[in-house]
Amino acid sequence: MSLTVEETTARNTELINEVLKAYPDKTAKRRAKHLTTQEEGKSDCNVKSNIKSIPGVMTIPPCAYAGSKGVVWGPIKDMIHISHGPVGCGQYSWGSRRNYYIGKTGIDSFVTMQFTSDFQEKDIVFGGDKKLEKIVDEIQELFPLNKGISVQSECPIGLIGDDIEAVSKKKSKQYEGHTIVPVRCEGFRGVSQSLGHHVANDAIKEWVLDKMDPDKNQFVATPYDVAIIGDYNIGGDAWSSRILLEEIGLRVIAQWSGDGTLAEMENTPKAKLNVLHCYRSMNYISRHMEEKFGIPWVEYNFFGPSQIEASLRQIASHFDDKIKEGAERVIAKYKALTDAVIAKYRPRLEGKTVMLFVGGLRPRHVIDAYGDLGMKVVGTGYEFGHNDDYQRTTHYVEDGTLIYDDVTSYEFEKFVEKIEPDLVGSGIKEKYVFQKMGVPFRQMHSWDYSGPYHGYDRFAIFARDMDMAINSPVWGMAKAPWKA
């Protein structure tokens, strides 16, 4: 029997209080600000966010280096991105994001390659600027078709005061204006990977867009040019988004970072509209282009038919009747397909509950995709969200929904144990914990090696994967050794 809003709110409030009892008083007081239930009239879900995690508790947010190199810069395929510092940061994050791209790896595309300055003790003592210069020389010799280089600083670089900006300027001049971008994304900076996004956006602004030679770019604009910003092509998502935009009559002149190029970044100021997928990681550069170049931007959501329809109409509203009619034509074209998907999977998933804890946009964007299948998200939260992320979340969640910011491992496990959702959607670090608890799980950062999930036809993949996770017969076949 489903609970009323009042009963759900009371249960979740009691659960929050129970979880907080495990902490010392000071810690409990701090964590209480991050845990709540959604109430009507609360414009930001009434939680505190973007605050440093408490030392001593196990939390999930990544660092600023991950936000810059792993999210924003890393997928730019024709640039080489140096993990500047000890080998571990680049090595252990190597190829983990499934940023699909087209190109010849090692020739004109470098996304899945790992470039590191491999700092040793002597580099810490004497500095690594000369080593960085040598690395740039080696890159230019070994990979002559690269279009640019970014220097992604790891923690020691900031601590010892290396001047990566001076090195970048010197080597860029030596190689006749070759784009070399220093990025101050040391992991100790800021609260989470979110500052890494911001730093990376600032680097794009200062070292790419503001340094462009207007005479070099012979790009010919049209009235229907758009740029896809903040789609990282996880499992091919950006390609699916691009197809829909082109089907309604728009011309996609750039998509980045996923399967993106330096030239596309440089073309973006010619767009008539920037369509923004991941608000958290790329709203900064979108706002900059709006202020400097007068390009409006709109956040879109291509997860599930309900949000795709709304987003296509919102995007089309910025153009003339040709594009508006194109949007309606595309919506009608795919209706039979999505109706068939819903008819197949909704009876199997109706009433199933989901708890989410992910980064970026997913804690809110996928909610209506679950709703299209008759499923209900009963708890959600952000790894590195800000106040404006939670403001945007209020439009997606129902009153009584459990909201948790920067949730600790203990809290999340306890919430799942007590609420008993039918599915948990989170990251790789959480996956095996919950599967060992017997809870169906989907990895919602990189789609568990599936996807893409964007677009009408890809909604079928999303529905299949959720059904496969929840209704797999394996849950009835596996028994704990002590129950066998």
UniProtKB/Swiss-Prot annotation:
Q: Which cofactor does it need?
A: [8Fe-7S] cluster; [7Fe-Mo-9S-C-homocitryl] cluster
Q: Where does [7Fe-Mo-9S-C-homocitryl] cluster bind?
A: C278, H445
The lineage's top-level taxon is Bacteria
UniProt-recorded Gene Ontology molecular function terms: ATP binding; iron-sulfur cluster binding; metal ion binding; nitrogenase activity
Keywords (alphabetical) are: ATP-binding, Iron, Iron-sulfur, Metal-binding, Molybdenum, Nitrogen fixation, Nucleotide-binding, Oxidoreductase
Quote the cofactor binding remark. Answer: Binds 1 [8Fe-7S] cluster per heterodimer.
Q: Does the keyword DNA damage apply?
A: no
GO CC annotations on file: molybdenum-iron nitrogenase complex
Transmembrane stretches in the record are none
Q: Which Pfam families match?
A: Oxidored_nitro (PF00148)
Entry's InterPro entries? Nase/OxRdtase_comp1, Nase_comp1_asu, Nase_comp1_CS, Nase_Mo-Fe_asu
PROSITE patterns the UniProt entry points to:
NITROGENASE_1_1, NITROGENASE_1_2
Q: Which residues are noted in the entry as [8Fe-7S] cluster-binding?
A: C63, C89, C155
The EC number on file is 1.18.6.1
**Gene Ontology biological process terms in this record:** nitrogen fixation
Q: Which reaction does it catalyse?
A: N2 + 8 reduced [2Fe-2S]-[ferredoxin] + 16 ATP + 16 H2O = H2 + 8 oxidized [2Fe-2S]-[ferredoxin] + 2 NH4(+) + 16 ADP + 16 phosphate + 6 H(+)
The annotated subunit structure for this chain is:
Tetramer of two alpha and two beta chains. Forms complex with the iron protein (nitrogenase component 2).
Family, similarity comment: Belongs to the NifD/NifK/NifE/NifN family.
Q: Which PANTHER family match?
A: NITROGENASE MOLYBDENUM-IRON PROTEIN ALPHA CHAIN (PTHR43457:SF1)
**Protein role:** This molybdenum-iron protein is part of the nitrogenase complex that catalyzes the key enzymatic reactions in nitrogen fixation.
Q: What is this protein called?
A: Nitrogenase molybdenum-iron protein alpha chain
Per the UniProt record, the source organism is Herbaspirillum seropedicae
Q: Source organism lineage?
A: Bacteria, Pseudomonadati, Pseudomonadota, Betaproteobacteria, Burkholderiales
